[in-house]
Every structure is written in C-alpha cells, then in structure tokens.
C-alpha cells in the first residue's frame, strides 16, 4: 500500500491523490517524465521529488519519514512494510497527570509474545527493549502513552508511531477504546472495564474526538 501512496508528498491532498489514481498513476514506479496527470508543472516536479525521497527512505528502512509526512489517520499505510519491527504498546498509571503520577505497568506485544514491565520489578528494562522496534502502535498514545513514558523515564521515543485512535475515528468509530471494541464486536468479558472507571487508579482516560490534524 505504501508505494500506492502520494498523500504524504508536498502539495498532494486526498482529492489530488484520488485524481492521480484515476488518471492511471497508481504507484511510484508508474511515474515518468512524460506521464499525463492532472498537475501543473510545479506540482508535478514536487511529486517527482517526493517519490524519489520516498523511495530513498523506504530503501533505508526508515518509517519515521512516512510517520511524519502522513496525516495521523493515514499512518496505517506504512504498516505492511514495517510490520516485522512493530511494538504494540499500552501503559497503566497511578493517575492522568504525567507530572505527578507514575507508570505502574507497561505491556508490549511484538506480534509473537507479550512482555510486561512492572514497577518495582523490571520497569526500567523497557527503556532498552523498546529500542529494538522501528514502529510503535498505540491507542491514544499521541496524547497519553508516549508523553507519559517520555516524561517518566526522561527519554525521547523517536520511533514512527501509529495511533489507532485517529484511524478508527476517521472510520466512524467513537467512544474511546472500549466503545470502539464494542462497535467492532470485540468482547473481553470482565477485562472490558470502562476507561473512566479506572482512570483514578491505574489506567489512561477514555479518549474521544482527536485534537490533532487528521
């Protein structure tokens, strides 16, 4: 999917990308100097430049470039190319304010196994282990998990980030993580405790409407 993507390139929005597909330009390799596409000379130059840069970063196995350039609700597009270096991440805390509260538990799933980091046991091991991955996947991590982790450990997480909150919101799913799970038919039984009920003790708040560009 990534090589069919143009929306991350300067001057290319969703409507223009759709027009490019309809004109026959469906992936990077189909672009040529004499291709007939609905763009001015300047925008065609920017498209060519963007494709060249994209090829370079994909060759260098660098998902951060695409994470920064793609709208948050389109970050799923680089998932297939980097799926072998992804950490699915969730944290639980003593409260909602990262300046006053602490992380009690971090759960990390890499597609094969789950690693749990617990305060007072092995929580500090997370700092080294997370560096093994090029992409982090969260729900509401842009607003909560990532800033909380960075402040708590005094580190900077430089990985590419896919926040499912923005992707799900763009698809019409509302009501925070638990609400999305219910709408998708996912039932975790007694584990499915509403986020607001747990916020005062150990878990992140239930997230609603995103507040960044999607």
Task: Annotate each PLM feature.
Residues 1-82:
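N-terminal accessory regions of nucleic-acid-interacting proteins
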Residues 69-72, 89, 117-119:
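Short gly/ser/thr-rich secondary-structure transition/capping motifs
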Residues 74-79, 93-97, 125-126:
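Catalytic micro-motifs at enzyme active sites that drive phosphoryl/nucleotidyl and oxygen chemistry
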Residues 84-94:
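Two-metal-ion RNase H-like nuclease active-site motif
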Residues 98-104:
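Short, flexible loop/turn motifs enriched in small residues
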Residues 105-198:
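Conserved DEDDh/DEDDy metal-dependent 3′-5′ exonuclease domain
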Residues 190-214:
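Long, charge-rich alpha-helical interaction segments
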